[in-house]
Amino acid sequence: MRLDLFKEQVAEAGKPLQPTGERSYFGLSGFHTCQRNLYYKAKGTPRKPIESRVYRIFQQGHDIEDQTIGLLKQVPNILIEEVDPETGRQFEVQFYGGHIKGHFDFRCRSEYYFGETTRKLGEIKSANDKNFKMYEKKGVQQTNETYYAQVQCYMHGTQNNEHWKDHALTQCLFIVFNKNTAELYIEMIDYNKAEAEHYLECFKNALQAPELPEKYSDNPTFYICRFCDFAEYCHKDKSIELEKIKQCKHIQPNMTSGNWFCTKTDCEFYKQQVGGLTEKCQSISQ
């Protein structure tokens, strides 16, 4: 009997059969309170390979989202839209020429429950029982600023936008699914222009910063640093291999076209992708 081998194989199961590839944009779901964390993400800094266990957690989140959408569709007197009727794809907002993008879960409308016919943005998250109780006690903004920033930027992306026209979204129906008890926490979050612009400014600074920002903390055991994907670069001074154009400290975004350009040499995007960076360029860790 090879039960131990079977356990090992099961533990490693769950990764996609095909690599999903790196996003060509910075997702709004990647907001972080540390500006250096945002900088590393914006520059495409390599992270640790994702474990199979983590992939399974991601898949569980997708399953919970589907389950919750199914529940919402069973509720009378409310319209649930999962895709943009104009594109046939998931609802999307973007900023700075497409360098920053976000996709939200659904859009809904119900005069019966919400007292008006205007559409609401919808976002679904899941949490363990401990964190779920925090949402109940303190609300989304104080419990998870990343999620709060995410939906504020989503709503901001629908304002004064030709694609959205008369359908700008100024409220978000935020739903948290308790993974332990299957309870639901529901909160209506109002759009706040000033806060959304603040969060987007953080993203913009990360894209355009010519130098590595200061650390959030010099203490590697500080909770924000301890669980950071880039702790090994920040606190252990691991060098960054110059594999992609965005990992060069001289690269800057074109905030209109969504492309990148080099501020130090005349190197071109495809040449850097194929042949590697020139010797004149430096790692963002230097």
Task: Give, region by region, the residue ranges found by the protein language model.
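A short mid-domain helix/strand-loop element embedded in enzyme catalytic domains
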Residues: L121-N128, V176-N180
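Structured loops at beta-to-helix junctions and adjacent beta-edge loops in soluble globular domains
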Residues: F31, K41-A42, K125, F177, ...
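Short beta-strand-loop-alpha-helix junction that forms the active-site gateway
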Residues: I124-Q141
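Metal-dependent nuclease catalytic regions and adjoining charged, substrate-binding loops involved
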Residues: M134, Q141-N144, Y148, C153, ...
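Metal-dependent nuclease catalytic cores that hydrolyze phosphodiester bonds in DNA/RNA
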Residues: M1-L121, N128-K130, Q286
